[in-house]
């Protein structure tokens, strides 16, 4: 991709110098538990990429807190603790979830006196039952398949300092919202919001998810690479689903393998690639930081917004 003029671009080697002497707080085993099962992130990636990123987030967080204090003083209002929200966007299968979980772990390590929490916007998809009623099952993941009113209200409650907020839970295992199961957000200092739509501007909304984010990251890669990771992930899902009849992927796991792979290729072509090209990729240049991946999920370049 051609570098936008409003970003500073860094090679991996340049970026790693920004925190070259920092101590790595993870082991290989703890990293294995964090990463998605087809993501090849290494301890070296954590050292080279994520440690400097956490230090940058720390600067952004400190600046944000100071601005909140100064604004309260100017308005002669009591100072309130308003959560700092980090948005992480990008295509399916590009590694957003791993990036979000890793950032959560590292922030918990370095921000020892702050509450760090993570939420995914998948929980705000309409249930499969509701999607069928709206004739939207073939559009699952597209902007109209999300309950944006509920997501915006959730983020507003977070910023407003509501003490306990419930968020619906989505399960990739059952491919649906889990009834009567919730994640609880308890007045965090930092909330990480991960999802394909964190930078989108739906045409029927007056306020957007990005209006609530204070620092945003877009995880980027060539679509042909993302497709290979998508298909690789599908193969791994089949390998883990064949012993569990409750798993959404079970029928594909025990059925004809070639037919299952052909279906996954159609899903990528007709749904996920289309969604990427029409709705996700156009949001890339709205991010504060772009993390670019190449073969093997290796991060080779980072772009940081200048202004």
From Swiss-Prot:
The keyword ATP-binding applies. Its EC number is 2.7.1.33. Gene3D superfamilies: P-loop containing nucleotide triphosphate hydrolases (3.40.50.300). It is found in: Cytoplasm. Belongs to the prokaryotic pantothenate kinase family. InterPro entries: P-loop_NTPase, PanK, PRK/URK. It is an enzyme of class 2 (transferase). One of its GO terms (molecular function) is ATP binding. This is Pantothenate kinase. It comes from Levilactobacillus brevis (strain ATCC 367 / BCRC 12310 / CIP 105137 / JCM 1170 / LMG 11437 / NCIMB 947 / NCTC 947) (Lactobacillus brevis). The gene is coaA. GO terms for cellular component: cytoplasm.
